[in-house]
């Protein structure tokens, strides 16, 4: 059974190009085209695609507004196409907040070294996102009880509500309901309603927290970091696969939403408690020195690395500096980046957690770590912040 795809773009050339690439994969099939967001919303209701590719800037209704409307009427995995500009970065992050799951640069030459690689990447992204459709549309209980809010809980925007809905939907079997904005609030409440085991601190001592992620990472990182207190006791290093022009905008957004400080990492930064350092896109981020005075090195890293930034590079250097004092996490993402770095951390005695399959947008990086027997705990996204705070005694 093929994956049904709706292509949305006001450029006839781009619609044709994307459609040709998608249809070249026998597992995928373009079932419709829309020239603006309003038309896309109507076609979603009519065709019920498995995945949507969406432009951002369009007449009549832009892509961000269309994403919000689609999440109200029929939640569907959406892959955004955007320009690699600062404005494009902000718009893309807005689209992810609205409910889109992933994005790619609109100029294919910006994401791959050759044409075949770009084609394969687009086909793979569409196929991976299709796997989340069943979770986004799974019926939910309509009248859950609501548990008291934690003192560390933070406001949850549309994207985070959707992420919680993915996990809850995968775990419940109830009567079908029509997906409306009210239903999506109910989805989030259902997470709190489910009895959950209490966490216990391991008793280990840490000096650094490290997180690596890719596809689905912007929402996942926002979900976790916005729930950490301003007096978080350790520095945090973040590695998110993201283009160079996006990381500054993403760090600024996280900083505005979080109690901790978040910044795009710079060469020579001294790691400070309560500050999260996001690896800049197109570079490698390494740690050097000693705990308490460790610094960041930002390097080009050469063309041999598949990922820039690369989780393995950052985690490996963290293991050498901090030995057994790192609390590390591998979150949602395609591929296996982070596995070898996490292996080094575990060998040095540090802690490695992984995101569970049900709450991942793409269960690739966490799966690689879990299958290798490296992670000690596999957690749903909505419980990571709680687990962290218990572990560090906050």
Curated annotation (Swiss-Prot):
Pfam families: CheB_methylest, Response_reg. CDD domains: CheB_Rec, REC_CheB-like. One of its GO terms (molecular function) is phosphorelay response regulator activity. GO terms for cellular component: cytoplasm. It is found in: Cytoplasm. Its EC number is 3.1.1.61, 3.5.1.44. Phosphorylated by CheA. Phosphorylation of the N-terminal regulatory domain activates the methylesterase activity. The modification 4-aspartylphosphate is found at residue 55. Residues 202-394 form the CheB-type methylesterase domain. It comes from the Bacteria. InterPro entries: CheB-like (IPR008248), CheB_C (IPR035909), CheY-like_superfamily (IPR011006), Sig_transdc_resp-reg_Me-estase (IPR000673), Sig_transdc_resp-reg_receiver (IPR001789). SUPFAM superfamilies: CheY-like (SSF52172), Methylesterase CheB, C-terminal domain (SSF52738). Keywords: Chemotaxis, Cytoplasm, Hydrolase, Phosphoprotein. GO terms for biological process: chemotaxis. Gene3D superfamilies: 3.40.50.2300, Methylesterase CheB, C-terminal domain. It is an enzyme of class 3 (hydrolase). The active site is at residues 214, 241, 337. Contains a C-terminal catalytic domain, and an N-terminal region which modulates catalytic activity. Involved in chemotaxis. Part of a chemotaxis signal transduction system that modulates chemotaxis in response to various stimuli. Catalyzes the demethylation of specific methylglutamate residues introduced into the chemoreceptors (methyl-accepting chemotaxis proteins or MCP) by CheR. Also mediates the irreversible deamidation of specific glutamine residues to glutamic acid. This is Protein-glutamate methylesterase/protein-glutamine glutaminase 2.
């Amino acid at each position: 059974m093929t994956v049904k795809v709706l292509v949305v773009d006001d450029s006839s050339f781009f619609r044709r190009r994307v459609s040709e690439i998608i249809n070249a994969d026998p597992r995928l099939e373009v079932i419709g085209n829309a020239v603006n967001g309003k038309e896309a919303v109507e076609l979603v209701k009519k065709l019920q695609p498995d995945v949507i590719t969406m432009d951002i800037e369009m007449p009549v209704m832009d892509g961000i507004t269309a994403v919000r409307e689609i999440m109200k009427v029929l939640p569907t995995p959406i892959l955004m196409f955007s320009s690699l500009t600062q404005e494009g970065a902000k718009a893309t992050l807005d689209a992810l907040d609205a409910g889109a799951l992933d994005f790619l640069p609109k100029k294919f030459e910006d994401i791959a070294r050759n044409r075949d690689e770009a084609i394969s990447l687009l086909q793979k992204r569409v196929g991976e996102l299709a796997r989340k459709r069943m979770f986004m549309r799974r019926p939910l209980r309509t009248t859950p009880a609501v548990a008291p809010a934690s003192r560390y809980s933070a406001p949850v925007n549309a994207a985070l509500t959707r992420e919680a809905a993915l996990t809850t939907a995968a775990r419940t079997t109830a009567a079908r309901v029509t997906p409306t904005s009210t239903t999506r609030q109910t989805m989030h409440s259902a997470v709190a309603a489910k009895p959950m085991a209490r966490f216990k601190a391991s008793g280990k001592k840490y000096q650094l927290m490290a997180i690596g992620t890719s596809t689905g990472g912007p929402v996942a990182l926002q979900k976790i970091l916005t729930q950490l207190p301003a007096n978080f006791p350790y520095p945090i290093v973040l590695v998110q696969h993201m283009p160079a022009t996006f990381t500054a905008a993403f760090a600024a957004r996280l900083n505005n939403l979080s109690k901790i400080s978040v910044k795009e990492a710079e060469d020579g930064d001294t790691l400070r408690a309560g500050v999260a350092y996001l690896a800049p896109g197109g570079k490698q981020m390494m740690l050097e020195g000693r705990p308490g005075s460790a610094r960041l090195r930002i390097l080009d890293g050469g063309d041999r690395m598949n990922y820039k930034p690369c989780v393995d590079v950052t985690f490996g250097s963290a293991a050498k500096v901090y030995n057994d004092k790192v609390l590390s996490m591998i979150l949602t993402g395609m591929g296996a980046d982070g596995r070898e770095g996490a292996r080094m951390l575990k060998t040095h005695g540090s802690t490695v957690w992984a995101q569970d399959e049900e709450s991942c947008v793409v269960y690739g990086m966490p799966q690689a770590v879990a299958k290798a027997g490296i992670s000690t705990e596999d957690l749903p996204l909505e419980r990571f912040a709680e687990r962290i705070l218990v572990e560090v005694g906050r």
